[in-house]
């Protein structure tokens, strides 16, 4: 397995293309209003449409509603979902797209238990 690079918080096409041409494998769009890098799905769509083949477009969420995930994923033409909140495995599993689950590392955390809970996740992102 090789290391993959995702550049997150993209809001402009020129930044996305610069990231990709510099070697990024994936481009992340933050669909969380509390972020300074928040983007609307209608703004993300032309950026995702400009991406070369084999670049993964990722929607980043923090405790979203299922309607918001469906809407943004469809409009923005996403290829992968990334959840950073307290989303349950059942919540994450309901979407047609693959997902990554972020885990906020705590001193007493059992990583194996967490990995077992999110078995459907394509990856776990360890956030320190």
Task: Label the model's feature ranges.
Residues 1-128:
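Conserved N-terminal beta1-alpha1 strand-loop-helix module at the mouth
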């Amino acid at each position: 397995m090789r290391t993959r690079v995702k550049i997150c918080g993209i809001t402009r096409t020129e930044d996305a293309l610069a990231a990709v041409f510099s070697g990024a494998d994936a481009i992340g769009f933050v669909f969380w209003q509390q972020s300074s890098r928040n983007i609307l799905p209608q703004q993300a769509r032309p950026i995702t449409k400009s991406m070369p083949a084999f670049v993964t477009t990722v929607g980043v969420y923090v405790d979203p509603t299922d309607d918001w995930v469906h809407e943004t994923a469809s409009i923005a033409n996403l290829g992968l979902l990334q959840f950073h909140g307290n989303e349950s495995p059942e919540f994450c599993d309901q979407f047609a797209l693959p997902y990554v689950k972020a885990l906020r590392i705590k001193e007493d955390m059992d990583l194996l238990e967490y990995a077992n809970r999110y078995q459907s996740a394509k990856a776990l992102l360890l956030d320190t």
